[in-house]
Amino acid sequence: MNVDHEVNLLVEEIRRLGSKGNDGKLSVKFGVLFSDDKCANLFEALVGTLKAAKKRKIVTYQGELLLQGVHDNVDIVLLQD
C-alpha cells in the first residue's frame, strides 16, 4: 500500500469515528482510532500514517509521536473536508 492511499483511508476512518467540535472540524481521540478493529486491520503502522497525514497538513494533533495508553486522549483533528 502506498502512503497516499493509507492517508485517504485514514481520512475516511476519522469521518466514520469522529465528531464535529465547536470549530466545525471533525476530530477523534487517538485511543479510539487505535483500538478500533477496522483501523487495526487497515493500518500496519497507524502512527506512521498519522505522521504522514500531519506532514501533508491533512490532520493535526499535539506532539510528534503518539503512543497507545499515554496519548489515548489526544485529539486527531481533520483539517480538510
Curated annotation (Swiss-Prot):
Database matches in Pfam families:
Costars
- Give the domain of life: Eukaryota
Q: Which InterPro entries match?
A: Costars, Costars_dom, Costars_sf
Which family is annotated?
Belongs to the costars family.
* Protein name, UniProt field: Costars family protein ABRACL
Point out the gene that encodes the protein. Answer: abracl
